[in-house]
Amino acid sequence: MKLHILAVGHKMPDWIATGFDEYAKRMPPELRIELREIKPEQRSSGRSAESVMASERQKIEAALPRNARIVALDERGKDWTTMQLANALPTWQQDGRDVAFLIGGADGLDPDLKARADMLLRVSSLTLPHAMVRVLLAEQLYRAWTITQNHPYHRV
C-alpha cells in the first residue's frame, strides 16, 4: 500500500522539502509516502474562489491513484488523535487500497471533492502555514507507523 499526498502548491521553501523528505525516507517500503504537487490555479482578478477550487479539483482528480481511499484534509474534518491514525493504518493495509491524502490550495478543497472523499480529516485546530501541512502529515504518518511497530519514537 502506498500513501499518496496530493498537495496543491509547488515551489515550496527548501526547509519544507527537507522536513517532508526526512519523514518519507523513514517509512518502510510497504508504506511508502509519495508526494504529488499540484500546480495551483492563477488567482486573477474577477475569478471566484469557487472557480479556482473547481479547476484545482480537476487536477487533483487526474492525479488520484485508481481505487484509492480518499482522505481529504479539511478544517471541519474528524479530529483524530495520533493513536486513532495508528489504529487505522493496519486496517487500511488489510484493505489493500492505496490511501490518497488531499491538501487543497489557498481556498481549500472543492466541495464536490470533499463529498467524494471517504473521510474528512482535520490536521489541527491551529491556523498553519499551508506548506507546513505536508510536513506535519508525513511526520504523523511516520509516528503512527512507529506506534504499530512498538518503536520507541513515540513517547506518551
Swiss-Prot record:
Q: Where does S-adenosyl-L-methionine bind?
A: L73, G104, V123, S124, S125, L126, T127, L128
Q: What's in the keyword line of the UniProt record?
A: Cytoplasm, Methyltransferase, rRNA processing, S-adenosyl-L-methionine, Transferase
EC main group: transferase
Reaction(s) the record says it catalyses: pseudouridine(1915) in 23S rRNA + S-adenosyl-L-methionine = N(3)-methylpseudouridine(1915) in 23S rRNA + S-adenosyl-L-homocysteine + H(+)
CDD domains reported in the protein's UniProt record = RlmH-like (cd18081)
Give the primary localization class: cytoplasm
E.C. number(s) listed in UniProt: 2.1.1.177
InterPro entries for the chain: Alpha/beta_knot_MTases, RlmH-like, tRNA_m1G_MTases_N
What top-level branch of life does the organism fall under? Bacteria
What is this protein's function?
A: Specifically methylates the pseudouridine at position 1915 (m3Psi1915) in 23S rRNA.
Under the subunit heading, UniProt states:
Homodimer.
Protein name (database record):
Ribosomal RNA large subunit methyltransferase H
Q: Which organism is it from?
A: Paraburkholderia phymatum (strain DSM 17167 / CIP 108236 / LMG 21445 / STM815)
Mind giving the lineage of the organism this protein is from? Bacteria, Pseudomonadati, Pseudomonadota, Betaproteobacteria, Burkholderiales
